[in-house]
Amino acid sequence: MNLKSKKTTAGAFHGVFAALVTPMKVGGDIDCDKLGRFAERLIGQGVHGLVPLGSTGEYYALNAGERERVLRVTLEAAAGRAPVVAGTNAGSTRDVIAFSRQAEQLGCAGVMLAPPYYSLPRLDELFAHFKAVNNAIGIPIMLYNYPGRTGVDMAPDFIERLAGLKQVRYVKESTGEMPRITELLRRCGDRLGVFCGCDTISLESFVVGAVGWVGGVVNVLPASHVKLYQLAVEKKDYVAARKLFFEMLPTLELMEDGGKYTQFVKAACKLMGHDVGAPRRPLAAATTGECSQLREALKQCAEGRRA
């Protein structure tokens, strides 16, 4: 291990971070008032951090002006009570740097970055991309490995290499492969805070040492997510944590395996009494039958029985 590359973990991000939905009006415009109220509600439920403009937040469907408004509204709602980590993904290094600098200037605590979509950069190109962003900002970077969406897989050895960059402090691992979490912790857990990015392996991830969980279903069941973290990480009451996790699992599995993650998250929010609108087209709202499935899954845990 290269001791020179070790980084301080003082004030580190940890806990449950909501991959924040972007509420939409009937016509497809962003509902900023609802976004602010929804973010405040999540913080009130004990969520430790907010991640606007991620996959669940439909960043790919928003223009630059809308992205800025989402950040401003989220930061105002958070009011320093919870860190805001902005998704700043884009198709080019130039745009990622611009979005990341904007996030820093607005007051975000960090940025979350996946590989640029569609262009399929090779690993040497990807390293140069992250290095350029690293050199352009002074806030932490959370790497985001989600090859199912980006087409580029960042294996643990490559992430270990990226950990040598000053601002690279965290990684959200979203392949759903538990060995990835353990290998990241083994290779660079002393330098990177590892976050689970796949809902169905959250409990196992906590048990082996993940510092947190970035999830979209946090929008739906925030109190349950926070309680699971408290039981598994803070209290180490694994019996109670397992019981709660098994109650949440039908919902988590339906979301992860249904092929309509964003659509289902938004539909489930409505079932829970918080109408955040439909996804922006080309995605469509969940069907009546799908909503019935979601309702039955939600009822398996105490928080979801109000659906």
Model-identified regions with their sequence ranges:
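Catalytic alpha/beta core domains of metabolic enzymes, predominantly
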Residues: 135-136, 147-249, 255-256
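Secondary-structure boundary/capping positions in well-ordered alpha/beta enzyme cores
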Residues: 81-82, 140, 169, 191, ...
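Alpha-helical structural signal in soluble globular domains
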Residues: 45, 69, 73-78, 102, ...
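Generic structural "secondary-structure junction" signal
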Residues: 22-26, 61-64, 120, 148, ...
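Short secondary-structure transition/capping segments
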Residues: 62-65, 98, 123-126, 154-156, ...
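A general structural signal for well-ordered alpha-helical segments in protein cores
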Residues: 35, 67, 71, 96, ...
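C-terminal alpha-helical cap/extension of soluble enzyme domains
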Residues: 2-5, 12-21, 41, 45-47, ...
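Active-site beta->alpha loop and helix N-cap motifs at the rims of alpha/beta catalytic domains
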Residues: 2-151
